[in-house]
UniProtKB/Swiss-Prot annotation:
Role: Cell wall formation. Catalyzes the addition of glutamate to the nucleotide precursor UDP-N-acetylmuramoyl-L-alanine (UMA).
Annotated protein name in UniProt: UDP-N-acetylmuramoylalanine--D-glutamate ligase
Source species of the chain: Photorhabdus laumondii subsp. laumondii (strain DSM 15139 / CIP 105565 / TT01)
InterPro entries in the record: Mur-like_cat_sf, Mur_ligase_C, Mur_ligase_C_dom_sf, Mur_ligase_cen, MurD
Binding residues for ATP: 112-118
Stored HAMAP family: MurD
Amino acid sequence: MADYLGKKVVIIGLGLTGLSCVDFFMARGVIPRVMDTRTAPPGKDKLPDGVECHSGSLNADWLMDADLIVVSPGIALATAVLQAAANAGIEIVGDIELFCREATAPIVAITGSNGKSTVTSLVGEMAKAANWQVGVGGNIGLPALELLKKSCQLYVLELSSFQLETTYSLNATAAAVLNVTEDHMDRYPQGVSQYRAAKLRIYHQAKRCIVNAQDPLTLPEMGMDSRCVSFGVDCGDYQLDSENAFLKVHNQSLLATNEIKLTGRHNYANGLVALALADAVGIPREASLATLTVYPGLDHRFQLARLNKGVRWINDSKATNVGSTMAALDGLNLEGTLYLLLGGDGKSADFSPLKPFLCGNKVQLYCFGRDGKQLAQLRPEIATLTETMEQAIRDIAPRLVAGDMVLLSPACASLDQFRNFEQRGHEFTRLAEELG
């Protein structure tokens, strides 16, 4: 455990995670300074007396005077003043690094462009089914430092590429990179290779590495070694059989896919990697398999919002990048027409990989938001451009017949028109109930 007494600590970024960092240092006899680029940062009113707070910008004087900077994942390390601090030898970490220095129980760590929240919560539920005391958090649910406040036999962390950039002591018992597809290119000017390098940091000092056999970008930099176990829908140590009817481990059939509560090939892949992670930390196999038969998935992840008159309305608002939308469309079989809602802030992504999924005459595109016009160019002859998602849905509703599906899987972030992807999903569900 690290000793911070006497150190000048600056925390960048408030909110729940920033406050958890403040609590962490106060409990160790250190009064940190806090700054946030927002003029009215959330949680400012909850700061303890004596904690100085600078808001509206980064305070370069404070940063250059610090011994330790704890940076929010939302602030790029490439920011000039942070580069200057790093060049001056000032230590820069994130809350996950603080957590890892203190944690004594094994850690399961999960990253990837898509599916990480589902896999993280699924492994957590598998541990609970075995009556383990488990802490689940990180990029989902509770800030990691909050998990230190209760006794745990296991920690399960969802980690973003941004969080991994400032983490050095993870030493996970089991670590997985689910997939790597283009995302956050606004933060990674060198492209996918820079983004991938951040993701692969999760494998550093891991005892077991879970690798996607169908995505070479998830391979550790040094290649496969004895620490590695693979998963994949079509190949791997953990895979589906040729008929997609069973989950198999080392060619032994374990569970029929029709017994799994989650649906879709991408969710079967999530089940496989969760099982591999659970096996790696010794969760009894029967508890893991039982969990797969009852786990319903998370809100806004390919979630059935409404089924009426033979029409399915699917809320996949969490599909905030191209890879996630590709996963939703992969293997989708419909009797009728797919009405696909795309749009929002594309984060400088290349949308062209979606094209192969938009073939045929049984799909209609409805594109909205900041990058709607660019998305409509994927297949202009079947695309309708609207300003908002609501306008698109009101146009779609009268056209629907039994067998059709309305799928919100936008391939974009929501912040151009919504508070977050959850609000976008709730709005879709409200409109589905009103018009469907």
